[in-house]
Amino acid sequence: MSQLLPAVEIETGSGDQPECAVIWLHGLGADGHDFEPIVDELDLDDLPPIRFVFPHAPTRPVTINGGYVMRAWYDIVSPDFSQRREDAQGVHESAQQIEALIARENARGIPDQRIVLAGFSQGGAIALHSGLRHKQRLAGILALSTYVPLADTLAAEAHTANRDVPIFMAHGHGDTVIPYDFAQRSCALLQAQGYPLQWHPYFCEHTIAMEEIRDIDVWLHKVLAPNA
């Protein structure tokens, strides 16, 4: 098992043992605290107790930022997200670390089918990459302001266990970090391969809109409902 990443953890409920988990991955240069406030913005009182896990990505030099060392799930070599220049090794290493976090939740009593993988930007890319290759059915994948990394390998590497996993994918029309049309191509790729994907566009930039938070809340109530 890969060494466990340090993480911020927040549990909902009144001290009851969590029955579900949301592993939420931050974006480039941020850390696990970045999305910590979103827990209070979601209306989760009528769901089973949830453990939110916000891991801190490892630090590494990022080529697009002049080699500056920052928290990143993988290196970004080019702003055009060319598949020929993707950091496949970094993506695979991060996927292994996410597998270790899932295994820890299993050890703490939460089965795979009650775990959501979530992420923003780079974190969303790793959530998609890891979730679609995971060997046990997950509750869902929440992919915000992101894209499918190593897209050419997905068809061959995707695991049948998650062929029908619910995917919530959202993007801002004004995103200049990961262009909207690039994210749309990732959406089209997943839909062409038969994944049950919900596509949510918003009038915002590279961020999360208030309307988006409400839609995430609705989606979480579907995939983490007691009888889901």
Model-derived segments and spans:
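Short alpha-helix in the alpha/beta-hydrolase fold that links the catalytic acid
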Residues: 35-40, 155, 179-189
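Short beta-strand/loop motif that positions the catalytic acidic residue
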Residues: 168-171, 175
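C-terminal catalytic histidine-bearing segment of alpha/beta-hydrolase fold enzymes
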Residues: 181-228
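Serine-hydrolase catalytic machinery in alpha/beta-hydrolase-like enzymes
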Residues: 2-113
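Conserved alpha/beta-hydrolase "nucleophile elbow" surrounding the catalytic nucleophile
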Residues: 26-28, 115-120, 172
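Primarily recognizes the serine-hydrolase "nucleophile elbow" in alpha/beta-hydrolase
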Residues: 111-162
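Alpha/beta-hydrolase-fold catalytic nucleophile elbow
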Residues: 55-56, 118, 142-145, 170, ...
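Short, proline-enriched alpha-helix->beta-strand connector loops that line the catalytic pocket
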Residues: 20, 162-167, 193-195
